Amino acid sequence: MSKLDLEEVNSMQRGKVHGPFLVENMVCQKNHMLTSKGVFLGSDPLKYAMPLMLLQMSVIIITSRLLYRLLKPLKQGMISAQVLAGIILGPSLFGQSSAYMQMFLPISGKITLQTLSNLGFFIHLFLLGLRIDASIIRKAGSKAILIGTASYALPFSLGNLTVLFLKNTYNLPPDVVHCISTVISLNAMTSFPVTTTVLAELNILNSDLGRLATNCSIVCEAFSWIVALVFRMFLRDGTLASVWSFVWVTALILVIFFVCRPAIIWLTERRSISIDKAGEIPFFPIIMVLLTISLTSEVLGVHAAFGAFWLGVSLPDGPPLGTGLTTKLEMFATSLMLPCFISISGLQTNFFIIGESHVKIIEAVILITYGCKFLGTAAASAYCNIQIGDAFSLALLMCCQGVIEIYTCVMWKDEKVLNTECFNLLIITLLLVTGISRFLVVCLYDPSKRYRSKSKRTILDTRQRNLQFRLLLCVYNVENVPSMVNLLEASYPSRFSPISVFTLHLVELKGRAHAVLVPHHQMNKLDPNTVQSTHIVNGFQRFEQQNQGTLMAQHFTAAAPFSSINDDICTLALDKKATLIVIPFHKQYAIDGTVDHVNPSIRNINLNVLEKAPCSVGIFIDRGETEGRRSVLMSYTWRNVAVIFIEGRDDAEALAFSMRIAEHPEVSVTMIHFRHKSSLQQNHVVDVESELAESYLINDFKNFAMSKPKISYREEIVRDGVETTQVISSLGDSFDLVVVGRDHDLESSVLYGLTDWSECPELGVIGDMFASSDFHFSVLVIHQQEGDSLAMDNSYKLPASPHRVGDPRVHPRFSVEEGFTSVDLHSNR
């Protein structure tokens, strides 16, 4: 019998064997103790593997969720909450009780939880890799390459110089030097999946800073993987073994990219064609490939998550593969198993065993590498002419760490690369630095500030200054197109008053990590979202062809989390100098007028756009699907349009838009002006500064009505909100479209009693009434964005049209006084 076998026998006789996972000693136990017989038969469920694992998972998930709720106001992420949950449940806090440890974390109960959580983790890492578009490395740009390189090179190089200095100055033991070198490699890295996760949680993934941080992180991670792979391979005993291991791992990556990737793509395309349904994926074959690659990784001496991650990277992100696999696997891997895996790092953390010998030196090196990373990123950003606030925010984002770094810490601790002291310090510092960085980024960076710093563009300004009318139309699906085309037709594009239209297809980000905002022609032709975008674009292009020379359209697609996609809307509106953003209402109506579907995410988008938009915003309540489908094919438009006017900036904006509709020779426009009885009294005093522009606008509409028989002005005298409601209810189905302002003077007697309740405050008091199922016409609720615009201030004075029943060819907003030329209204189409 060999010496090794003899030691094993002696160990078993002492009641212990070498553990199969962490190379530690374990107490021998019966291997059939899996499920309990039940407490009624005298069995203790927590002595069995299955009940104990279920208890551990339940407690970990519940604790991490509670901590996340508590820390959410401080902008902390789920990963931080999960690590804290492990620390609280582990030996650092609750684990000080030996009875608790024997019940909740016995030695025999660790392996089952760790094995299952590792399974979930490598599936999660596969999903993270799946969301990565490897092509963005080529698209990163010189700025991102410079910043990403500086973010990795400075902490890595200065950190190692610090190690040489400490080694020679303090005569550090070799194991401590080796541990510190490992710390430097870890802290120098910035993981692309972690960065995009942080950006998404902070709702800045599709902001300018978010896109730059995304590109910088993938450049930094490319360096990290190269160094980590070489470091991992050449730690082996024996040079030849290290070389062979490196060769075989490289061969595995080549097999993944040049064998597995083409095979999976071929299977996906073949299945989609055979069942004639886009989006279907060969789920079972992909899972078998994933398990095989993960097993091969373990055989070659690297973690199963390594092969899983690179398999994910090799596959196309987004639909159908990215979206389909994410939908099927994310709940199990991310929501159920990942909290257990992350919490295990906290369970292994013990504050009470941190010694005093080299703690200060190790912590100093950790902080130095973080500081070098921050300074390197900030300096490179300043060199690239990035504003100082954004440069600091970017540097803080590059210092954030998460699941990849935690996995690396746990793996190196298990392999004895990191000692317990170093592991504890890394986890604690990671929590503190990431938590502080996230909070400071929220304080320093506000993507909407670039919108607020600009002067606002309004419809009133466009009319007064004779500017081109520029519309940004947001659509989610093909069903939104017909009524949007109706709205364009009603807006009456003409040779002397053309319209520039920018359509934006909004797609919720699924199956990919980075947000995109691109012109339609740059979309991936194999992406199912491109197919839907093409159908949307075709509808608008058909209308554009019917109005050549009077309407020019550009088409864009934005894929981003719905929590922050409002930044794409506002960015495009700012870049294209849009006058009005039109966004669909979050409720969809059936043919009979009842609410068919409600999407709370769309409502949040609308609220964010209303708050941050650089121009006027219109929320469109679409009830004209049947008629709308005819608009694309038959140039059908609404025949009867009403505008509700009470008072205020938004009502004036709605009236200005309706006056453009009134130019259409085939559309009848009725202005319904609500006035209180007191306003008719001769001694009624008005605020001249606030109502002067309204008076000019109303008089202008009245004069326009005198020259066009299809334009009418109707005055309704009411005493309170009850009579206002009665008048509105009497509208019935007389109109195809009603245009109304969002905000009014809430103290107005016209609205008395109506302001106490509102289901949808984003529509205002009157708009909220129109959203009920009692009405069957479409509604456009317009909000004039507050800001430094000409509209509704003292400088805005639309010239009063001459008192004439006059020439119908003369456009009411053109006059000799303003230096404009009269145009022929009936021959300019």
Curated annotation (Swiss-Prot):
Preferentially expressed in pollen but also detected in vegetative tissues like leaf trichomes and root vascular tissues. InterPro entries: Cation/H_exchanger_TM, CPA2_transporter, Na+/solute_symporter_sf. It is a multi-pass membrane protein. It is found in: Membrane. The modification Phosphoserine is found at residue 827. Keywords: Antiport, Ion transport, Membrane, Phosphoprotein, Potassium, Potassium transport, Transmembrane, Transmembrane helix, Transport. Its main location: membrane. The chain crosses the membrane at residues 48-68, 77-97, 117-137, 145-165, 180-200, 215-235, 240-260, 281-301, 329-349, 361-383, 392-412, 425-445. It holds the Pfam family CHX17_C. One of its GO terms (biological process) is proton transmembrane transport. GO terms for cellular component: membrane. The keyword Ribonucleoprotein does not apply. One of its GO terms (molecular function) is antiporter activity. Belongs to the monovalent cation:proton antiporter 2 (CPA2) transporter (TC 2.A.37) family. CHX (TC 2.A.37.4) subfamily. May operate as a cation/H(+) antiporter. This is Cation/H(+) antiporter 14. It comes from Arabidopsis thaliana (Mouse-ear cress). The gene is CHX14.
